[in-house]
């Protein structure tokens, strides 16, 4: 789980929470992760290859996690633009990461 430390940045104020969630998930052998509201990203963020800490990094962190543990991430957002951005910056984890354009309540009801 060494990968998680690269997300430990002073601007990532949620890092301790994400780290704890990931540790607990690994200890419990969770393989399926469901996210409502994907990381949005910005073109500037991707063009300069800088982390957008204010946008939350959950999609990228969970995508990398499920790639390592051979699990699955299912991420839902109502915005096609947000989904397209998230697909772009998680493409190297696309084998284990799935995106859905949908209202989160509908998505969770039918998941």
Enumerate the predicted regions with their spans.
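A short alpha-helical cap/connector motif
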Residues: 1-111
């Amino acid at each position: 789980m060494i990968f998680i430390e690269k997300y430990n940045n002073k601007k990532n104020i949620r890092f301790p929470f994400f780290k704890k969630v990931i540790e607990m998930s690994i200890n419990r052998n969770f393989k399926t992760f469901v996210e409502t509201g994907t990381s949005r990203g910005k073109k500037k963020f991707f063009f300069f290859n800088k982390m957008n800490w204010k946008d939350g990094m959950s999609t990228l962190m969970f995508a990398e996690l499920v790639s390592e543990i051979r699990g699955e991430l299912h991420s839902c957002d109502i915005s096609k633009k947000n989904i397209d951005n998230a697909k772009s910056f998680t493409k190297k984890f696309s084998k284990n990461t799935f995106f859905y354009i949908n209202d989160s309540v509908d998505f969770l009801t039918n998941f």
